[in-house]
Design a protein with these regions (language model features):
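Aromatic-rich, lipid-facing transmembrane alpha helices and their immediate juxtamembrane interface loops
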Residues: 1-169
């Protein structure tokens, strides 16, 4: 077995998949009723990630940055929610990249990489990636992941996926 093979339980395996899930979800987060879900999703992700360094960095980031900048997201249009989420995830992703000595990527690349596709295609990719992440994390339950946190994370992401599947509002 080659030392270059990335193990499913490692951040190098599930990290890129999580970013694709988040950026894809952000592309279709054009609903007024999901603004309060996003901070909870990221907090739940921080609690669930099997990498303590990643957990601590995300928790610290969330203490100092708001994902949604308004007190009542229902006062913002669906497109406004989408823009805030895309911008904040882009900033978060670049902060992680800088910490890991990976070059930043321009915000203009988000649409090229994640957008300009039918919602159904984006959702299909999200479902596939979610299966890969869940399968990678499942063996780590009890050792690196609290089962209750894992269940909460799956449930809250599933709720967001259900809402964005319905289209904009």
């Amino acid at each position: 077995m080659s030392a270059d093979i990335i193990k499913p339980g490692s951040p190098q395996y599930w990290g890129p998949r999580l970013w694709r899930i988040f950026h894809n979800l952000a592309e279709i987060s054009d609903r007024r009723d999901i603004g309060m879900l996003w901070p909870n999703i990221l907090k739940s992700t921080a609690a669930t990630m099997p990498c303590s360094k990643c957990r601590n960095h995300l928790t610290d980031y969330l203490k100092h940055h708001k994902i949604i900048s308004v007190t009542n997201p229902l006062t913002v249009t669906g497109q406004g929610i989408r823009t805030q989420i895309r911008n904040q995830l882009h900033h978060l992703h670049n902060q992680v990249n800088l910490r890991n000595n990976i070059p930043e990527f321009p915000i203009s690349s988000l649409t090229h990489i994640y957008g300009n596709r039918p919602r159904e295609q984006i959702l299909a990719e999200i479902h596939s990636l979610m299966t890969e992440v869940k399968d990678a994390w499942q063996p780590l339950l009890h050792s690196s992941i609290n089962p209750g946190d894992f269940t909460n994370w799956k449930n809250i992401i599933s709720l967001l996926i259900s809402l964005v599947s319905a289209g904009p509002n």
